[in-house]
Amino acid sequence: MSTPTPLSYKDAGVDIDAGNALVQNIKSAVKRTRRPEVMGNLGGFGALCELPTKYKHPVLVSGTDGVGTKLRLAIDFKSHDTVGIDLVAMCVNDLIVQGAEPLFFLDYYATGKLDVETATSVVNGIGEGCFQSGCALIGGETAEMPGMYEGEDYDLAGFCVGVVEKADIIDGTKVKAGDALIALASSGPHSNGYSLIRKVLEVSKADPQMDLNGKPLIKHLLEPTKIYVKSLLKLIAESDVHAMAHITGGGFWENIPRVLPDNCKAVVQGDSWQWPVVFDWLQTAGNIETYEMYRTFNCGVGMIVALPADKVDAALELLKAEGENAWHIGHIAARNGDEEQVEIL
């Protein structure tokens, strides 16, 4: 009777050595993001972080998000170096809306078969996003789960914690009729609407490598999400910000009302900016109604800020000095009864 061949975890599809190699590869990316509040090093069971001492009454603000089906395009076109930036951006841009400074970030990377090179590229992108937003990449989890994902497909989730002075929380309660609205330009579709984008590509049979205004269509679609943290922290410190809306899934119609009092509505001047060419292409190729465009995509606007009308000029000057493309996009008006809270003229 023959002796059965001993089985190992690797025989079952989990390569511990590959996981260890990944940890070694990403150490420099993690180190680059370190903040003075971080205690200990990568690899502990839990990650430790002190609260910054400058806060008198600190309030923690948390958020979690993913990259959605933009990952499908990234995987299909083997473009893994910027989806990590997307992951961080989707989390930290939500935190800054409430005035919070991002403090630390954790990621979850799940795959059927761990490809160390791909995972390293992704996590390096996460490190870059954390560096751009000033938060520490403090830990994460890499889960190799054979049978759960097809081949080397992977999924990402991010978790971020920020901190804000209790007296300085931005929650929209200061918004009032007469306030001005400022828009900050997006870098593209960011990380929302990609199921519709992929449907447009399928139905139109467009070549993703086709030229669109000087660069391939796929480059427009995979442009990483813009991170607004540093410029908005400066604006918050130097102006009187009443509210901010991160234009993500649900577009204008769903996100702006989240930060408005019931008695206010946002009046947006639709002719105050020109949609980036990728949105014009999507609308034409997919025969998408304008209402649906504003419901699904950011249409070139990644963030909207409400502030007193007499602060507009100084705010625009500050934002442009910080490298933002920003403009006066509309105003806040009184809302009557059951009026819609967003009006695009």
Swiss-Prot record:
InterPro entries, per database record: PurM-like_C_dom, PurM-like_C_sf, PurM-like_N, PurM-like_N_sf, PurM_cligase
Tell me a Gene Ontology molecular-function term this record carries: ATP binding
Stated EC number for the protein is 6.3.3.1
Enzyme class, first EC level, given as a word: ligase
Q: Which GO terms describe its cellular component?
A: cytosol
Localization in the cell: Cytoplasm
Q: Please give one Pfam family short name.
A: AIRS
UniProt key word Cytoplasm? yes
The UniProt entry's GO biological process terms, in alphabetical order, are: 'de novo' IMP biosynthetic process; adenine biosynthetic process
Query: What reaction does this catalyse?
Result: 2-formamido-N(1)-(5-O-phospho-beta-D-ribosyl)acetamidine + ATP = 5-amino-1-(5-phospho-beta-D-ribosyl)imidazole + ADP + phosphate + H(+)
* SUPFAM superfamilies attached to this UniProt entry: PurM C-terminal domain-like, PurM N-terminal domain-like
- Functional pathway: Purine metabolism; IMP biosynthesis via de novo pathway; 5-amino-1-(5-phospho-D-ribosyl)imidazole from N(2)-formyl-N(1)-(5-phospho-D-ribosyl)glycinamide: step 2/2
Q: Does the keyword Kinase apply?
A: no
Q: Which UniProt keywords apply?
A: ATP-binding, Cytoplasm, Ligase, Nucleotide-binding, Purine biosynthesis
The record's NCBIfam families line, in alphabetical order, gives:
purM
Concerning its family, UniProt says: Belongs to the AIR synthase family.
Name-wise, this protein is: Phosphoribosylformylglycinamidine cyclo-ligase
